[in-house]
Every structure is written in structure tokens, then in C-alpha cells.
């Protein structure tokens, strides 16, 4: 029997690579081979980190193309030119690959690689979008460009869109806020126009039916398919206890003392974990406020602070003024295995930027959240966490758009102090952890949805 082969065209950022690799592993388990298509920069970083030491599983191969930025985009680089070069060079590479490799029967692409769908269409290869944000966010974008722009732009405190809960302006994706440059809205419009080029576009979403039942059915024009949570099996259904990482880290985890060993010394549900993802960089003044808030809580904490380097690769961050006190009370690392941390019994709460991967991971591990959203989908994710699922609280920004240390303290205590709100948040966190695992279980909705999708791939 000839095995099917799906090509995964994946944007070279950790937030896209992690769910794409996990999706690839699920395809492999179902008997479908995978070609992982990404940039040279991402491929090199993935190949050089410890997570890649075990090698590729059978049926998975990597194809890397040069986007002109093989050493990555510098912190002060031209993002617009970067995306333009990515599209031009990536399209050419994918076109040649599909022309010369007739084994590929289906293309699945990241939304920042929407051009991959256009190339697939030219090559008469069917495609689907792998959406790595909540279905709710895709619905908001869709309705904005399909009749609801005036209502959303009006800045009302109660924006009502079809089949979605009421939204206020601060909970919209930041691409739709008045202060965001128009080119970002146009970029998202182009992504949706790519989907509109299909008769009934398929969108694979890193969510599950019970989590977003209304959003998954809100757009008649598209077929939204919940296939998540896309996280390693050891932290979800337990089908493969050895699968403890995504397998494609762009950054090495900290070698200075083992985070898990440190957590082993702490009481159950006592530690505050603080991480703002692989991209976000706060100014020093904001970092000082976060530090003050953690010290005021008086609880042990694990704080992941990425090393910040300038265009010449030199470290440029200054030490926090309270670094000595912070190191006495908690542990600061430059990188760690987030899932191992979230799954540890000592974890009591997660202070996060609310990137969707982090949101899904905390939900799947049953960890309450303090939401500190900054941009993109994070603001909507925070709304869902606080109001729809009840698994956390969202910080209140000060007049300057930052977060005071006292607000960090207030929110951490709200989910950690054992009071009525704390108990409710923890009960909800456990409930959604159970539902997430059920979704990927043997009779779960996501597994059924994935199998139905693969049946369609087989007929392609």
C-alpha cells in the first residue's frame, strides 16, 4: 500500500513550529508521511538543539529553503522586506518541490505562509490551513472583513458578532485596533482571501470541540476542524509517555541547574511560573515592576528571561536592580522546557503573555493563569481564559500601557491565596484539563476529526 505524504509549510517561529511538529507526529502515527518545509534558519536551529538529538522519526523529512535571512532576522531588521523575501523565495522553492516530488498529495500551511496555498493550487495539489490561534480569533477577522467592520471600529464596550460571546475593544486582536498600522489589517485580509479562493476551505485548528463549540461552526464559508490540543502525548493523553517534547526548539534550554530538580524541592501548588514566550521583550522598567510584584507576593517563583542580544550577537540586557533579592526567593533561567514545568505538581500559577501555545499548554496541564497580554491574538486569548473558561485572571494595565508591580501581586494572590476566586479558578482549570485529554483520547472529538480529515486526504 502506498503511503500518503502531506507537506507542512511552516513559518519559522516557535509558535508555529511547535504545533506543526506535533501535528506531523499525529499524521505519522496515522500512517501518513510528512515533509516539513521551512526556512534554513529554522531548520539549522532545530537540528542543533538538544531536542533533535534523537533524530527524525521514520516517515518525516525536512526540506529547507533560503529566505535570504539564513542567520535569522536581526532585532532591528526590516520585517516588511523579510516577509516579502520569504514569500518570493519560498514560493519558488515550493513550486519546484511540488513539480519534482509527486509523492506529496496534500499541503498544510501556516497562516503566515498563505502563499503556499496559492502555489499548491497552481500545482493542483489540495491544501488546508493550520490555524495556530483560537477559532474565535479567526472568526473575529472573518466578520471584520465581511460586514462587521463598522461595528468593530466603533470601539464599543460590547461588540456582538455572530455565535461569539460579547467582546470589548481591549479584547480584540491588536491587528484590528485603531492605532495599529493599516498594513497589518490588509495582511490579514489577504490571508482570508486565500481561503476564499477555495470552494469550502479547510482550516485545521489547534483547539477542540468542547473548548470553542460555537466558534468552530460560526463561519459557513469555511470548514473549521478542531484537532487539538497539539501538545506532546506525555502531557496529554499519555499514549506515548516517552514523547515529552515537540522536538524542534529554536532555543537551547538553560543548562544552569535543572528546573525540574529545583521544582522537586518545592511544596505542591506553591510556585509561580513566569514566562512571556520566545518573541516578546519587555523594557527594563516593566521587568523591574514584574520583579517587584513577585517579591511582594513572597512566593517561590521560576522566571524565564530570555537572553537579549543586539544585531552583533552581543548581550545587551542590564541586571535588574532587585536581582539579588529575586535570586534568593526564586529561580531565573534563560530557557526551560515549559511543558515539564507546567506539568510539575509544585506549579501553582502561570504568569503569561497568553500566546496561544502557552494558553493551550496551561489548559491541558490544569494550571491557573495570570494573563498579561500584549499583542496579536493574546488579548482575545486573555478574554477567553478569564471569561469563557474561567481558568485565570487578566491584569489591568496602567495609564502608560504597562503593568504595575502591585497589579502583578494582586492577580497572583487572587489565584494563589486559597480564597473563593482561587478555588473556582482551580476547579475550572482541572475541568478543562480533563476535557482536553478526553478530546485526544481514543473516542475523543479531535482524534475523530483528524481521522475524518485523513480520509479526505486519502481521496485527494
Curated annotation (Swiss-Prot):
SUPFAM superfamilies: UDP-Glycosyltransferase/glycogen phosphorylase. Keywords: Glycosyltransferase, Signal, Transferase. UDP-alpha-D-glucose binds at residues 338, 353, 356-358, 361, 377-378. Pathway: Pigment biosynthesis; anthocyanin biosynthesis. GO terms for molecular function: hexosyltransferase activity; quercetin 3-O-glucosyltransferase activity; quercetin 7-O-glucosyltransferase activity; UDP-D-glucose:delphinidin 3-O-glucosyl-5-O-caffeoylglucoside -O-beta-D-glucosyltransferase activity. Residues 1-22 form the signal peptide. Its EC number is 2.4.1.298. It catalyses: an anthocyanidin 3-O-beta-D-glucoside + UDP-alpha-D-glucose = an anthocyanidin 3,5-di-O-beta-D-glucoside + UDP + 2 H(+). Optimum pH is 8.0-8.5. It comes from the Eukaryota. Transmembrane segments: none annotated. Pfam families: UDPGT. One of its GO terms (biological process) is pigmentation. Belongs to the UDP-glycosyltransferase family. Catalyzes the glucosylation at the O-5 position of anthocyanidin 3-glucosides to form anthocyanidin 3,5-di-O-glucosides using UDP-glucose as sugar donor. Anthocyanidin 3,5-di-O-glucosides are molecules that are responsible for pigmentation. Also acts on anthocyanidin 3-O-(6-O-malonylglucoside). Much less active with hydroxycinnamoylglucose derivatives. No activity in the absence of the 3-O-glucoside group. This is Anthocyanidin 3-O-glucoside 5-O-glucosyltransferase 1. The lineage of its organism: Eukaryota, Viridiplantae, Streptophyta, Embryophyta, Tracheophyta. The gene is PF3R4.
Amino acid at each position: 500500500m502506498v503511503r500518503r505524504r502531506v507537506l507542512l509549510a511552516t513559518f519559522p517561529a516557535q509558535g508555529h513550529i511547535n504545533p506543526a511538529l506535533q501535528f506531523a507526529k499525529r499524521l505519522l502515527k496515522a500512517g501518513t508521511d510528512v515533509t516539513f518545509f521551512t526556512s534554513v534558519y529554522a531548520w539549522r536551529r532545530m537540528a542543533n538543539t538538544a531536542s533533535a538529538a534523537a533524530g527524525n522519526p521514520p516517515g518525516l523529512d525536512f526540506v529547507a529553503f533560503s529566505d535570504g535571512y539564513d542567520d535569522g532576522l536581526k532585532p532591528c531588521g526590516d520585517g516588511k522586506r523579510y516577509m516579502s523575501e520569504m514569500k518570493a523565495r519560498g514560493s519558488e522553492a515550493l513550486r519546484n518541490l511540488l513539480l519534482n516530488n509527486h509523492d506529496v498529495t496534500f499541503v498544510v500551511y501556516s497562516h503566515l505562509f498563505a502563499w503556499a496555498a496559492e502555489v499548491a493550487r497552481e500545482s493542483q495539489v489540495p491544501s488546508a490551513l493550520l490555524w495556530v490561534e483560537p477559532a474565535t480569533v479567526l472568526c473575529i477577522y472573518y466578520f471584520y472583513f465581511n460586514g462587521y467592520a463598522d461595528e468593530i471600529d466603533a470601539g464599543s464596550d460590547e461588540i456582538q458578532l455572530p455565535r461569539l460571546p460579547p467582546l470589548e475593544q481591549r479584547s480584540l486582536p491588536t491587528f484590528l485596533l485603531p492605532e495599529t498600522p493599516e498594513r497589518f489589517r490588509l495582511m490579514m485580509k489577504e490571508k482570508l482571501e486565500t481561503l476564499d479562493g477555495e470552494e469550502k476551505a479547510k482550516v485545521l485548528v489547534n483547539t477542540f470541540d468542547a473548548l470553542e463549540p460555537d466558534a468552530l461552526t460560526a463561519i459557513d464559508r469555511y470548514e473549521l476542524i478542531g484537532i487539538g490540543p497539539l501538545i506532546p502525548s506525555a502531557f496529554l493523553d499519555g499514549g506515548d509517555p516517552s514523547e515529552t517534547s515537540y522536538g524542534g526548539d529554536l532555543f537551547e534550554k538553560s543548562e544552569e541547574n535543572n528546573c525540574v530538580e529545583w521544582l522537586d524541592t518545592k511544596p505542591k501548588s506553591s510556585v509561580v511560573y513566569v514566562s512571556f514566550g520566545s518573541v516578546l521583550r519587555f523594557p527594563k522598567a516593566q521587568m523591574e515592576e514584574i520583579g517587584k510584584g513577585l517579591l511582594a507576593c513572597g512566593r517561590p517563583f521560576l522566571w524565564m528571561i530570555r537572553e537579549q542580544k543586539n544585531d552583533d550577537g552581543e548581550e545587551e540586557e542590564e541586571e535588574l536592580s532587585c536581582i539579588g533579592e529575586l535570586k534568593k526567593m526564586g529561580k531565573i533561567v534563560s530557557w526551560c522546557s515549559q511543558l515539564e514545568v507546567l506539568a510539575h505538581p509544585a506549579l501553582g500559577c502561570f504568569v503569561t503573555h497568553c500566546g496561544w501555545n502557552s494558553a493551550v499548554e496551561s489548559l491541558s496541564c490544569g494550571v491557573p493563569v495570570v494573563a498579561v497580554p500584549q499583542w496579536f491574538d493574546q488579548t482575545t486569548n486573555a478574554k477567553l481564559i478569564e471569561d469563557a473558561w474561567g481558568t485565570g485572571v487578566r491584569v489591568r494595565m496602567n495609564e502608560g500601557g504597562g503593568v504595575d508591580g502591585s497589579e502583578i501581586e494582586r492577580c497572583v494572590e487572587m489565584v494563589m491565596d486559597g480564597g473563593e476566586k482561587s478555588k473556582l479558578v482551580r476547579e475550572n482549570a482541572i475541568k478543562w484539563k480533563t476535557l482536553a485529554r478526553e478530546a485526544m483520547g481514543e473516542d475523543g472529538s479531535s482524534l475523530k476529526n483528524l481521522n475524518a480529515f485523513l480520509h479526505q486526504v486519502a481521496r485527494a
